[in-house]
Design a protein with these regions (language model features):
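Phosphate-handling DNA/RNA-contact segment within nucleic-acid enzymes
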Residues: 51-54, 59-61, 80, 101-201
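Non-catalytic accessory segments of DNA primases and related replication-initiation nucleases
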Residues: 1-123, 152
Length: 201
């Protein structure tokens, strides 16, 4: 009723915003937005502008598309590659691993033709040449990258046949800065909520 919490173990206390910041490791603005979203509300910003750019919904659509591909016969070689490296189906599912066919337009055809050009460019999923968009990831195992909130913001792709580059990452976008992200951090946080610090080697 008093709208605050108290932990008898660590003596931490505060309001709902403070609790969410500590529990989910969010900054103040992200905590406010998360709470508002859970209530079906939007946070008003001065002049209608947000300080942070939201991840493109196209990235999550691409992740689901590539993830579905991994369950098809077209991904037989990719599945064998993962098995040879000890990556189980359970692990692949946990990390949303997928497969991009070796085609120039598989993803673009899946998404459809009605997506505005600026959204295609902003997503980091396509290459642009001669006024045409081509799938950036082709013939690769896809490893999606999430931010600390669990939103899909980018991906890395490992080629399974001969070709270069062996590894290809999403370019930096308005919502993805490679220097600020760590692959797998969200999954680690979800697996163990009480982790206060990590040592990366």
């Amino acid at each position: 009723d008093k709208q605050f919490f108290y932990c008898f173990v660590c003596q931490e206390s505060g309001n709902a915003i403070h609790f969410l910041r500590q529990y989910e490791n969010l900054d103040f603005v992200d905590a406010i937005e998360t709470l508002a979203s859970s209530l079906g509300l939007t946070v008003p910003y001065e002049n209608g502008k947000q300080d942070k750019i939201k991840p493109s919904g196209l990235v999550e659509q691409a992740v689901r598309f590539y993830q579905k591909n991994l369950n098809n016969q077209i991904a037989e070689k990719a599945i064998q590659y993962l098995k040879d490296r000890g990556i189980t189906g359970e692990t692949a599912k946990k990390f949303n691993i997928g497969f991009a066919e070796d085609k120039w337009d598989a993803l673009s055809n899946h998404l459809g033709k009605d997506i505005p050009i600026n959204e295609l460019e902003a997503s980091g999923l396509f290459s642009h040449k001669d006024n045409k968009f081509y799938d950036r990831f082709r013939g690769r195992i896809i490893f999606p990258i999430r931010n600390i909130k669990g939103e899909f913001i980018a991906m890395g792709g490992r080629i399974i046949d001969e070709g270069e580059p062996k590894y290809l990452n999403s370019p930096e976008t308005a919502f993805f800065n490679k220097s600020n992200e760590l692959f797998g951090l969200f999954e680690v946080k979800e697996a163990e909520k009480k982790i206060a610090s990590l040592i990366v080697v």
